[in-house]
Amino acid sequence: MSEELTPQQVTRMAKLQKRLRTEVGRAIGDYNMIEEGDRVMCCLSGGKDSYAMLDILLNLQQRAPIKFEIVAVNLDQKQPGFPEDILPAYLDTLGVAYHILEKDTYSIVKDKIPEGKTTCSLCSRLRRGTLYGFAQKIGATKIALGHHRDDIIETMFLNMFFAGKMKAMPPKLLSDDGANMVIRPLAYSREKDIAEYAGLKGFPIIPCNLCGSQENLKRAAVKEMLVQWDRDYPGRIETIFTAMQNTAPSQGVDREQFDFLSLTRDPDAPMRGDVAESDLPAFDFVDVANNGHINLDKAVRIDVVNTYTPD
């Protein structure tokens, strides 16, 4: 830590650590992210999220009922001014196994992306390909990324608004070739908790704008929208995330997710609705279309006393 914390800050940090540890443990359990004997490759960017992820996983490793390895990996993409000494120095203090990789993806990105355009998408794809390959090389069974709950929700809205897809970041993902399993242990954790925890812990943060790329304006707009919602309607973000875990394909419009074409009614089904009328009190209403008086009675269910049939 860069400076001495007050007793109140120490207490707050312990509370945040417990919360994050609980959330990460629950996410790991819910999605079976880490199993006995796993070698987990924690990808570090030098940002608050990946630092917090490594910190919490190391903490859980000491408490978990199963045994698993943790290997920290950072990819130096040769961005101008990247401080090469910060991560090794920090990781040395932890005593965790680590690898620092070097690959000049920066030059590739600058060559392919016009000046002034955001480079984040291509940069991340090149980084992912390098990390996937290295994970296989060292025998890593899981690749842990530092995306949190807010990232997942933002991605869903980005895809809805700009790509016409209901798609987010899954907490657990098998790569297209089936060779790598990606996990996101912070899937249940809020960004503001992670940011506060990182500040109290004094992680040596490396800025992500060394490449000079403009911020992804679409993601920034979605993030601001969610921040405003959280401010104006407390609990809305939690409700959105809960909704993402409770989808009902049969109640949607995606024909790939539900077979609407094969739906058929059962002509032998009993004459009843979703609610058993026998459990409802008798009541009357007027059939506006036919001007007929319909009485719903517990004994006879439906008694039509007047019906009009056109010639």
Swiss-Prot record:
Q: What is its EC number?
A: 2.8.1.-
Q: Which residues does the record give as [4Fe-4S] cluster binding sites? A: 120, 123, 211
Details of cofactor binding: Binds 1 [4Fe-4S] cluster per subunit. The cluster is chelated by three Cys residues, the fourth Fe has a free coordination site that may bind a sulfur atom transferred from the persulfide of IscS.
Q: Which UniProt keywords apply?
A: 4Fe-4S, ATP-binding, Cytoplasm, Iron, Iron-sulfur, Magnesium, Metal-binding, Nucleotide-binding, RNA-binding, Transferase, tRNA processing, tRNA-binding
Pfam families to which the protein is assigned, alphabetical: ATP_bind_3
Classify the source by domain of life.
Bacteria
> Motif range for PP-loop motif?
45-50
Instruction: Please give the biological process terms from Gene Ontology that the record holds.
Output: tRNA thio-modification
Catalytic activity reads:
cytidine(32) in tRNA + S-sulfanyl-L-cysteinyl-[cysteine desulfurase] + AH2 + ATP = 2-thiocytidine(32) in tRNA + L-cysteinyl-[cysteine desulfurase] + A + AMP + diphosphate + H(+)
**Pathway, per Swiss-Prot/TrEMBL?**
tRNA modification
Where in or outside the cell it occurs: the entry states:
Cytoplasm
Q: Does the keyword Iron apply?
A: yes
Cofactor(s) demanded: Mg(2+); [4Fe-4S] cluster
What's the family?
Belongs to the TtcA family.
What's this protein's function?
Answer: Catalyzes the ATP-dependent 2-thiolation of cytidine in position 32 of tRNA, to form 2-thiocytidine (s(2)C32). The sulfur atoms are provided by the cysteine/cysteine desulfurase (IscS) system.
Further information: The thiolation reaction likely consists of two steps: a first activation step by ATP to form an adenylated intermediate of the target base of tRNA, and a second nucleophilic substitution step of the sulfur (S) atom supplied by the hydrosulfide attached to the Fe-S cluster.
Name of this chain's protein:
tRNA-cytidine(32) 2-sulfurtransferase
Q: Which gene encodes it?
A: ttcA
